[in-house]
Amino acid sequence: MSMLCYTLIIAFLIGIWAAPKSEDNVPLGSPATSDLSDTSCAQTHEGLKTSRNTDQRHPAPKKADDQELGSVANIIVDPKLFQKRQFQSPRVLFSTQPPPLSRDEQSVEFLDNEDALNRNIQAKRQNHPVHDLGEQSVCDSISEWVTKTTATDIKGNTVTVKVDVNLNNQVYKQYFFETKCRNPNPVPSGCRGIDSSHWNSYCTTTQTFVRALTMEGNQASWRFIRIDTACVCVISKKT
């Protein structure tokens, strides 16, 4: 009987000694598990914070298309600004497509695709004035709507002209109606109809100032710029 008791006691002690003592078998919520969880959470939080800081210091590069669209969208103009009379000019127009050649309006305009198309159709239907065969211009000129990227302002400085403008979430182009000489010498002697035996003559393009939307740093501002507006004959008496 005593031998049986000794055998059971020895087996019990061997079982206790052989039991695993690793922290993996510690019950959930014990101090060892809490320390491991806190350490793991702290390391994870620190890793996320470091990742965010790295992303902020090294932002992902933007695509070229995104940068191009951003440069257009950054310049947003309030349409009320154009209602002021001092900013209106018959030679400046904002449109989504090239406007017709006829310049029949006397103020700054905003044309969308449909309006510009209707204006083009109306311009084609207009009857051109018929001149008598004996009437001819002293100088031949050509008129057209153009866009500009740079121009000379009233102070003689070269400025950047805003081509695309965001108005009411729609991109418009800024057009200028220019008139220039087709040829400085429409006839071999110079201007047409000038007595070349007494006068020297030639045709030249003259300019005037109009208000245009320009860029000054990152700000859009109004400036007077020079554009071609007429073709005139210059004469001088022969000596």
From Swiss-Prot:
Basic and acidic residues composition bias: residue spans: 47-66
Tell me the keywords, alphabetical order. Cleavage on pair of basic residues, Disulfide bond, Growth factor, Lipid-binding, Metalloenzyme inhibitor, Metalloprotease inhibitor, Protease inhibitor, Secreted, Signal, Toxin
Q: Could you say which tissues express the protein in this record? A: Expressed by the venom gland.
Q: Which InterPro entries does the entry mention? A: Cystine-knot_cytokine, Nerve_growth_factor-like, Nerve_growth_factor-rel, Nerve_growth_factor_bsu, Nerve_growth_factor_CS, Venom_nerve_growth_factor
Task: List the GO biological process terms.
Answer: cell surface receptor protein tyrosine kinase signaling pathway; modulation of chemical synaptic transmission; negative regulation of neuron apoptotic process; nerve development; nerve growth factor signaling pathway; neuron projection morphogenesis
Q: Which cysteines are joined by disulfide bonds?
A: C139-C203, C181-C231, C191-C233
Location relative to the cell: Secreted
Q: Which top-level group of life is the source organism from?
A: Eukaryota
Q: Tell me the leader sequence span.
A: 1-18
**PROSITE patterns according to UniProt:** NGF_1, NGF_2
**Which residues of the precursor form the propeptide?**
19-125
Q: What Pfam families would the database entry show?
A: NGF
The UniProt record lists the keyword Signal: yes
**Molecular function via GO:** growth factor activity; lipid binding; metalloendopeptidase inhibitor activity; nerve growth factor receptor binding; toxin activity
List every stretch annotated Disordered: 47-68
Cellular component (GO) terms are: axon; dendrite; extracellular space; synaptic vesicle
Q: Which SUPFAM superfamilies match?
A: Cystine-knot cytokines (SSF57501)
- What is the similarity comment for this entry? Belongs to the NGF-beta family.
Instruction: Spell out the subunit comment.
Output: Homodimer; non-covalently linked.
Function according to Swiss-Prot or TrEMBL: Nerve growth factor is important for the development and maintenance of the sympathetic and sensory nervous systems. It stimulates division and differentiation of sympathetic and embryonic sensory neurons as well as basal forebrain cholinergic neurons in the brain. Its relevance in the snake venom is not clear. However, it has been shown to inhibit metalloproteinase-dependent proteolysis of platelet glycoprotein Ib alpha, suggesting a metalloproteinase inhibition to prevent metalloprotease autodigestion and/or protection against prey proteases.
What is the recorded name of this protein? Answer: Venom nerve growth factor
